[in-house]
Amino acid sequence: MLDIISLGWGSLLAIFSFSIALVVWGRNGF
C-alpha cells in the first residue's frame, strides 16, 4: 500500500517538474 502511494507521489512530482521545465524552456525559447 505504501509502495503504491509513494510511487504515485513520485510520478506526480515527476510530471509536475517536467511540465514546469517545459514552461520555462518555452518562455526562454529553448
UniProtKB/Swiss-Prot annotation:
- Asked if the Swiss-Prot or TrEMBL record annotates the protein with the keyword Nuclease, the reply is no
What is its quaternary makeup? Answer: The 4 large subunits of the cytochrome b6-f complex are cytochrome b6, subunit IV (17 kDa polypeptide, PetD), cytochrome f and the Rieske protein, while the 4 small subunits are PetG, PetL, PetM and PetN. The complex functions as a dimer.
Q: Which organism is it from?
A: Gracilaria tenuistipitata var. liui (Red alga)
List where in the cell it is found: Plastid, Chloroplast thylakoid membrane
Q: Does the keyword Plastid apply?
A: yes
Query: Topology versus the membrane, per the UniProt entry?
Result: Single-pass membrane protein
HAMAP family cross-referenced by the UniProt entry: Cytb6_f_PetN
- Which GO CC terms are listed, alphabetically? chloroplast thylakoid membrane; cytochrome b6f complex
List this protein's GO terms for biological process.
cytochrome complex assembly; photosynthesis
- List the GO molecular function terms: electron transporter, transferring electrons within cytochrome b6/f complex of photosystem II activity
Q: Which family does it belong to?
A: Belongs to the PetN family.
Q: What UniProt keywords apply to this chain's record, in alphabetical order?
A: Chloroplast, Electron transport, Membrane, Photosynthesis, Plastid, Thylakoid, Transmembrane, Transmembrane helix, Transport
InterPro entries per the UniProt record, alphabetical: Cytochr_b6-f_cplx_su8_sf, Cytochrome_b6-f_cplx_su8
Residues passing through the membrane, by range: 4-24
| Name of this protein | Cytochrome b6-f complex subunit 8
Function text: Component of the cytochrome b6-f complex, which mediates electron transfer between photosystem II (PSII) and photosystem I (PSI), cyclic electron flow around PSI, and state transitions.
